[in-house]
């Protein structure tokens, strides 16, 4: 089992190829993998302009808006408008998806997994006081505001806004969260596909 804090200040931003936004990679597997050879990837994306999303054949995607409003268009579907209260939006990375121009830049948590090897779950949770998250193969907990304490066994640390606690190999273990005020966290679980 490993427990690691990924500080927001250490997540460099890189512009999208189409110039319509920025991405901050939080974690990827294998370590150091790029956009063509990852097995799974979690990032923060800021959408600032209209334009198509990159396609990723064989990849399942999840996105969760942290605030604002964003409308997505997919071939053969009605447009979908997401906001800061919307549940995670799942879509295949092979599908052409375009974002309409947001009124102001919006940021989302973006999760991508190679569907033949991994599954992912993404959720927003509000904590006030104490809460627990059940660990999976990989669990990432992103704080929306300062002052979220994360603990597992002998490990403990505090998260500031957009910091992430990453826990690997703690499937079934309880990861404890504590905050002295109501705050949202985003929880990402990634699991390897098991035979049978």
Where would I find each of the regions flagged by the language model?
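Jelly-roll (double-stranded beta-helix
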Residues: 1-196
């Amino acid at each position: 089992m490993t427990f690691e804090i990924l500080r927001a200040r250490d997540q460099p931003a890189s512009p999208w190829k189409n110039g319509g936004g920025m991405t901050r990679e939080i974690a990827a597997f294998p370590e150091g993998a790029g956009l063509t050879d990852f097995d799974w990837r979690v990032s923060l994306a800021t959408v600032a302009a209209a334009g198509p999303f990159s396609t990723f054949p064989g990849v399942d995607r999840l996105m969760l808006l942290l605030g604002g409003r964003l409308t997505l268009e997919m071939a053969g579907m009605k447009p979908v408008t997401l906001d800061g209260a919307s549940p995670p939006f799942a879509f295949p990375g092979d599908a052409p998806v375009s974002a309409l121009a947001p009124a102001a830049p919006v940021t989302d948590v973006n999760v991508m997994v190679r569907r033949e090897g991994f599954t992912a779950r993404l959720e927003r949770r509000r904590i006030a006081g104490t809460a627990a998250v059940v660990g999976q193969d990989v669990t990432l907990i992103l704080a929306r505001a300062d002052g979220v304490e994360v603990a597992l066994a002998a490990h403990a640390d505090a998260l500031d806004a957009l910091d992430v606690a990453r826990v690997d190999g703690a499937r079934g273990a309880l990861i404890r969260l504590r905050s002295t005020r109501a705050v949202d966290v985003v929880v990402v679980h990634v699991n390897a596909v098991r035979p049978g």
